[in-house]
């Protein structure tokens, strides 16, 4: 428990290994790989609590998270730490220290207003921006279309779960020699978003990767039609890399399970009020 609290209050990170050789690429647009236990067993524990929250009416979610949904300022904090003075999103600037893509649902918790759902058996969709592997779209590679000689490539990932995000990180670990994942204090600890910071580009591998992508998409520039789910590797990445990734993501999901459990206990408290011991513990933890 002390370690969970420490990660929430101080953040957590991991440096991923560099691979000189790209894995065999086979880009297919339109569908994500399905989840499996191989890519994170903790998710399946954590998703049970997410489903409990997903059943709650959104007006109640807003009430109980109003004071703990602080503005997400993790990207700004990364810019400050790395002394990044200029960034470009999707080619909007010709010169910058970093090229950036934010795939997260910034400062949002749920997708649409909704009443309560009777039971998990009646859940047909994930209405929360939490643990949704379908949120990872091919936009995660969009910065590479605009990458010239920037020092950093920075991605705000919408989720850490599923094969898709691990395959993506494995590719980035051949495109850049330094790839780090961070879950900052100033990110939302209600959601499984995180930041990837990549630097020291491997030009040879980047050229090979972009050649494959452009041949599949039949375009040398980014097209919005490519902003869809995708799969990119036929074969699973090696177990060593998966375990290194899970070393980081498991810390995040353990923290989220604790936070979500407190929130659910607060929302279902016998007091029928936001003034209860679970909510007080939650506020103390996150503020």
Swiss-Prot record:
GO terms for cellular component: virion component. Regulatory subunit of the mRNA cap enzyme which stabilizes the catalytic subunit and enhances its methyltransferase activity through an allosteric mechanism. Heterodimeric mRNA capping enzyme catalyzes the linkage of a N7-methyl-guanosine moiety to the first transcribed nucleotide (cap 0 structure), whereas the polymerase associated VP39 is responsible for a second methylation at the 2'-O position of the ribose (cap 1 structure). This is mRNA-capping enzyme regulatory subunit. The lineage of its organism: Viruses, Varidnaviria, Bamfordvirae, Nucleocytoviricota, Pokkesviricetes. It comes from the Viruses. Disulfide bonds: none annotated. Gene3D superfamilies: Poxvirus mRNA capping enzyme, small subunit. Keywords: mRNA capping, mRNA processing, Transcription, Transcription regulation, Transcription termination, Virion. GO terms for biological process: DNA-templated transcription termination. InterPro entries: Poxvirus_mRNA-cap_ssu, Poxvirus_mRNA-cap_ssu_sf. It comes from Vaccinia virus (strain Ankara) (VACV). One of its GO terms (molecular function) is mRNA 5'-cap (guanine-N7-)-methyltransferase activity. It is found in: Virion. Its main location: virion. Heterodimer of a catalytic and a regulatory subunit. Intrinsic methyltransferase activity of the catalytic subunit is weak and needs to be stimulated 30- to 50-fold by the regulatory subunit, which is itself catalytically inert. Belongs to the chordopoxvirinae mRNA-capping enzyme regulatory subunit family.
């Amino acid at each position: 428990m002390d370690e969970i609290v420490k990660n929430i209050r101080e953040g957590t990170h991991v440096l991923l290994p560099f691979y000189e050789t790209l894995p065999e690429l086979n880009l297919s647009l339109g569908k994500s790989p399905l989840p499996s236990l191989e890519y994170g067993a903790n998710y399946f524990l954590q998703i049970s609590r997410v489903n409990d929250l997903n059943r709650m009416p959104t007006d109640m979610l807003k009430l109980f998270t109003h004071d703990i949904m602080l503005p997400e300022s993790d990207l700004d904090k990364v810019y400050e730490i790395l002394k990044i003075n200029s960034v470009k999103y999707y080619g909007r600037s010709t010169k910058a220290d970093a090229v950036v893509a934010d795939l997260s649902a910034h400062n949002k918790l749920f997708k649409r207003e909704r009443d309560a759902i009777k039971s998990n058996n009646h859940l047909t969709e994930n209405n929360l921006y939490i643990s949704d592997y379908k949120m990872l779209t091919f936009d995660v590679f969009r910065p590479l279309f605009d990458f010239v000689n920037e020092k950093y490539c920075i991605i705000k990932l919408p989720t850490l779960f599923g094969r898709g995000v691990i395959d993506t990180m494995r590719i980035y670990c051949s495109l850049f020699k330094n790839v780090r994942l961070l879950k900052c204090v100033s990110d939302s600890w209600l959601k499984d978003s995180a930041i990837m910071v990549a630097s020291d580009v491997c030009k040879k591998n980047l050229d090979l990767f972009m050649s494959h992508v452009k041949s599949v998409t039949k375009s040398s520039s980014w097209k919005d039609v490519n902003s869809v789910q995708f799969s990119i590797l036929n074969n699973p990445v090696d177990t060593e890399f998966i375990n290194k990734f899970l070393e980081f993501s498991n810390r995040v999901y353990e923290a989220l399970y604790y936070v979500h459990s407190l929130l659910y206990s607060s929302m279902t408290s016998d007091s029928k009020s936001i003034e209860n011991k679970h909510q007080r513990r939650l506020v103390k933890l996150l503020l």
